[in-house]
């Protein structure tokens, strides 16, 4: 039986590819998709969800727009990474359907209530919507199987020296998620920076030759340009968000550890840092499964295999 999931995202090139991967995978039942501000402004990320679902001919999936800003801070966006639209590069279709007439939290709550079994929440943007759901609907915590997030890092940040972008945008929300008591799976930069897509991988996707694989290749063409900056030392572009979906499909591709994670909300230099108690120094019980390594070739092969679904 397919695993029911709720996808909360802020598309964003890698979010868009996570949607493509999820909807090409019969093991997953995508119940709804919600959008958050993050990689771009809230109206643009919502539009990008609708554009992607129009492209994939999945306008049956309920969509709702979420929080327009973080819980306690002003919004930061990553337009330098994702461009003016949030999905610069390919020519994507205009949306052919409208979002639900409700908020992201309302759609999430409705989806959880109506599901016969606990639902996995996959969150690939800032954690604002998920935190609002947890705070406003404590009665639904038992309907959440786990929360799989792309965010954080044990080591280096990518937005500040200490912080990864998604967590930095709304650290208070991320702290609520990690301390919720619900199992959290963290795909942080420690693993996503190893999940790099090289130029030859992009050409492999393009050669699959269907409209969706072509769009994915064009998304990656644009995404790679930002990551060519020598400061990163990358061979390709790290495909952060699809690591969450890939872990659900093939957990054997990933090495994980069980650790306690907290989020720094106050620090002078470290706001948004995910503090991972790797050596069990705090005495706190582990609250997260933390991804630390990935079989890069296996990850690329999975993407290539699932892109053939759209032939």
Swiss-Prot record:
EC number of the protein: 3.2.-.-
A GO cellular component annotation in the UniProt record: cytosol
Enzyme class at the top of the EC tree: hydrolase
Cysteines engaged in disulfide bonds, as pairs: none
Active site per UniProt: 240
Alphabetically ordered keywords of this record: Glycosidase, Hydrolase
The keyword Ribosomal protein is annotated on this UniProt entry: no
A GO molecular-function descriptor: purine nucleosidase activity
Single GO BP term: pyrimidine nucleobase metabolic process
Gene3D superfamilies for this protein: Ribonucleoside hydrolase-like
Homology family: Belongs to the IUNH family. RihA subfamily.
UniProt-listed PANTHER family: INOSINE-URIDINE PREFERRING NUCLEOSIDE HYDROLASE (PTHR12304), URIDINE NUCLEOSIDASE (PTHR12304:SF4)
HAMAP family linked to this entry: Pyrim_hydro_RihA
Name by which UniProt lists this protein: Pyrimidine-specific ribonucleoside hydrolase RihA
Organism: Shigella sonnei (strain Ss046)
